[in-house]
């Protein structure tokens, strides 16, 4: 049976597809970490095409949304940035694209029947070139 987090990630991948994102990878892993979703945001065009987005998905159960640091701390942000660098090293065709790090919070009940709220924090943290 899928975990709550996996179900939440699947729900968010569908939601992103409906919002004109192209999902490139789900649960992309290296020894440095994992990125929940890697997608192209086709809604925002740049000179090099769409925007390459590294997305961390958090599924919360009926809790209040508050400080971003409680949702994704600095250490987790650094791990995602490091993993994104590995993705770019292995997928050079994306190297000239604008890069964004997003956090999407799905607040729901335990069965994910009705999402109470989806909060999409674009450019939530980091910069791949720090």
Swiss-Prot record:
GO terms for molecular function: nucleic acid binding. Transmembrane segments: none annotated. Disulfide bonds: none annotated. PANTHER family: UPF0102 PROTEIN YRAN (PTHR34039:SF1). HAMAP family: UPF0102 (MF_00048). Belongs to the UPF0102 family. This is UPF0102 protein TDE_2303. It comes from Treponema denticola (strain ATCC 35405 / DSM 14222 / CIP 103919 / JCM 8153 / KCTC 15104).
């Amino acid at each position: 049976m899928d975990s709550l987090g996996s179900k939440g990630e699947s729900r968010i991948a569908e939601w992103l597809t409906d919002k004109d994102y192209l999902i490139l990878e789900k649960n992309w892993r290296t020894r440095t970490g994992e990125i929940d979703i890697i997608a192209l945001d086709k809604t925002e065009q740049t000179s090099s095409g769409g925007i390459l987005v590294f997305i961390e998905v958090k599924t919360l159960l009926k809790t209040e949304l508050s400080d971003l640091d409680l949702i994704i701390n600095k250490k987790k942000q650094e791990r995602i940035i490091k993993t994104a660098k590995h993705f770019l090293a292995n997928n050079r065709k994306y190297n000239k694209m604008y890069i964004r790090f997003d956090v999407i919070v799905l607040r729901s009940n335990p069965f994910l029947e009705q999402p109470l709220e989806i909060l999409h924090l674009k450019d939530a943290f980091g910069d791949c070139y720090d």
